[in-house]
Amino acid sequence: SRGSEMCIRDRCISLLKVMLTNYCIYDCAYCVNRRSNDLPRATFSVSELVELTMEFYRRNYIEGLFLSSGVVRNPDYTMERLVRVAKDLRQVYRFNGYIHLKSIPGASRELVNEAGLYADRLSVNVEIPKEENLKLLAPEKDHKSVFAPMKYIQQGVLESKEERQKFRHAPR
């Protein structure tokens, strides 16, 4: 993993761009971390990654975290670990930096929604938009599981917007 930058408007911030693990249960032909690829594998524990992020943040090496992961055990197990990293950073360490989480295709709506409570940004990789191509290159994945997290994120954004509208007109 190496640091990177993200720029919004005229401001760029340095990010720790890291994967929780490069192990993966899937064997997607397009992915370097596919199960059949013979490469060194590594996994952070939740606490290791939280401590590493905080150490870099305290030393002003980074201003935020960009976190992704290979899929270990199943999508919910992996997503739950990503959420725990963000939650621990926010609630235990009072981390005020930027957090961008990659949502795991196939993860439950509840976990994607919980991720949205702690992350500044959620995104989903959609490598293959057509179902027939997905079956060719990633036969263990299905189209619905790839697109579901985007739907969950969109619904969460709309619900949040509705809540803000309600409170904007509340009596003071």
Give short role names for the model-derived ranges.
Residues 33-39, 65-75, 99:
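Short acidic, glycine/Ser/Thr-rich loop/turn "cap" segments at secondary-structure junctions
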Residues 52-68:
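Short Fe-S-cluster ligation motifs
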